[in-house]
A protein has these predicted regions:
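N-terminal accessory scaffold of Fe(II)-dependent oxygenases
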Residues: 1-266, 274-306
Length: 306
């Protein structure tokens, strides 16, 4: 390993390791479920997941994602309690980060270390040992199309990264009592996160460029052939953009809804909603996950830890 690679490695979080035995994998899973439940203040992650899907069965079927003006905290809580996604305008566009260009980002923050997803990360999106490449942000922004990815592979993608230098340039609304740190998603047209769901409420801010997002309600998971990546993250092999109903016949019963997010948009994705995200242009996005009982379940006292 080169000196530069060692230096970058020390500035980035360690890569996850695979369990060496089934027993170790089971023990890790149990410990992770307990940690996740404690952080969210719920009696059980499994019970929370089932409650999310149960609530979703009572919701109307969406044919489009509502676009509304920004809400104050009280208005957001009331709307989000329905358990349906919606998009807000008039908030993110005021962030200082939105005024920066890619050139500005390179000049001011190019020395930040980043970790890019490389190879065919779309087919193996949530595998713990999927290929990654560490580099400086400036190096990533300077990449030429096709330089480090092969034919048929998507472009390298800086996804789900903590870029702490950028946090002061984003003014997140105080919609939740507790939230995880901001995560950043940077990449050219064609970068993608395949269909999956997080069992945490999610705020997704679009900084630059446009992205196409498909959303599917939580209770349609029975049609999506889900795979558990961790207790609060499930992936699906089904692609709503290019549906293969021969391989996934049950997916005919799923009802995805599409939305295009543009610079300045803030999308609320309720816990448990499946979503697939593809960049239509060179894009920068940021998101934060809430760390608590989903707003749609606030009145379900049986889920709260004593």
């Amino acid at each position: 390993m080169s000196g530069k690679a060692v230096e970058l490695k020390g500035q980035l979080p360690p890569l996850p390791t695979l369990a060496s035995t089934p027993e170790e994998a089971a023990a890790r899973k149990l410990a992770q479920e307990e940690r996740d439940a404690a952080v969210r203040g719920v009696v059980s992650i499994g019970a929370m997941r089932e409650a999310v899907k149960r609530h979703a069965r009572s919701l109307p079927l969406l044919t489009e994602i509502p676009r509304i003006k920004r809400l104050d905290a009280q208005g957001f809580a009331a709307r989000a309690a329905q358990g349906l996604p919606f998009l807000m305008t008039g908030l993110v566009e005021r962030w200082p980060l939105c005024s920066l260009t890619p050139r500005d980002l390179r000049e001011r923050h190019g020395a930040m270390p980043v970790r890019a997803r490389v190879g065919d990360y779309i087919r193996q999106p949530f595998r713990a040992n999927r290929p990654m490449r560490d580099m400086l942000l400036a190096e990533y922004l300077d990449l030429e199309p096709g330089r480090i990815h092969g034919p048929g592979e998507p472009p390298p993608y800086v996804g789900n990264m903590e870029l702490r230098e950028l946090n002061r340039l984003c003014h997140w609304p105080a919609y939740f009592g507790k939230m995880g740190p901001p995560r950043y998603w940077l990449g050219p047209v064609g970068t993608m996160t395949p269909l999956h769901c997080d069992f945490d409420d999610n705020l997704f801010a679009q900084i630059w460029g446009a992205k196409r997002i498909f959303l599917v309600p939580p209770h349609h998971d029975a049609f999506l052939y889900p795979n558990e990546a961790n207790p609060v993250l499930f992936g699906s092999p089904f692609d709503p953009e290019q549906p293969d109903f021969d391989a996934y016949p049950l997916a005919r019963q799923a009802r995805p809804v599409e939305v295009i997010v543009k610079p300045g948009d803030l999308l609320y994705v309720p816990a448990g909603w499946y979503h697939q995200v593809r960049a239509l242009e060179f894009s920068l996005s940021s998101n934060r996950w809430a760390r608590g009982l989903p707003l749609a379940l606030q009145n379900d006292l049986a889920l709260r830890r004593p």
